[in-house]
Amino acid sequence: MIKNLIFDLGGVIMTIDQNEALRRFKELGVADIERRLDPYTQTGIFGDVEEGKVTAEEFRAELSRIVGRTLSFDDCKYGWLGYRKEVPQRNLDALRRLRGEGYRLILLSNTNPFMMSWALTKDFDGGTGSLEDYFYALYLSYRIGVMKPDAKFFQAVIDNEHILPEESLFVDDGPRNIEAARKLGFNTMCPKNGEDWPQALMEMLAK
C-alpha cells in the first residue's frame, strides 16, 4: 500500500523550459551555457550551487567572473527562473487532493537558492501558497549537500522520514533518477516534462 508520495519539482510539479533558461543566461553573457546546463543534473559552478558546494553569493561572484561584469543576485535569479514555464493548476489541485486523502507528500529536488527564492514565497502558486504549503517535507539538494541520482539523497529521506521504499511512490521526469530510486525499492512513475500526470497517478494509486 502506498503511503508516501515523493515528487520532483522541475519537470513534474513545475513545467520547465530549458531553452528559455539557456536564452536568459546567454543574455547575461554566458556564451557557452549549452555545455553548462542540463535538464536534470547540473555540472561545474551550476552543479556546485545545486549541491551546496558554493553559496548563492559565491555563485554570483563566479558567474560575474565568467561573463566579465558584475551580476546581482536578481540577475542570477532571472537566469535560473528561465526554467520556470508554469506551475499548472491541475498539479496544485492534485497535490491538495492527495494531501487531503492522507498521503504524506515529500519533495525531492535538485535545486538552488535562486529558484527557491521564488518557490518558497506565495508567488509559487500565484499568490496563495508557497511550495512548503503543499508538502510535509522538502528535501533540497543545496541544503542536503547531495544531488539525485546519488543514492545518499534518497537514503536521507528514508532515514529522516522513517519511511519504507515499498510503501512510497517516487515521481520524477529523469530516467536516471527513476533508476536510482528503483534500485532502493521505491515504486516509480516517470512522466515527461509538461505531461498531464495527475490522472495517471490517481489511477495508479487506486489499483
Where are these regions (language model features)?
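Asp-based, Mg2+/Mn2+-dependent phosphohydrolase catalytic module
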Residues: 1-3, 7, 112-113, 118-207
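N-terminal helical cap/lid subdomain that shapes the substrate entry/recognition surface
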Residues: 2-93, 100-101, 112-116
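Short amphipathic alpha-helical segments and helix-helix/interface helices
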Residues: 22, 92-96, 107, 154, ...
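A structural alpha-helix within SAM-dependent methyltransferase catalytic domains
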Residues: 96-99, 158
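Anion (oxyanion) recognition and catalysis
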Residues: 99-100, 182
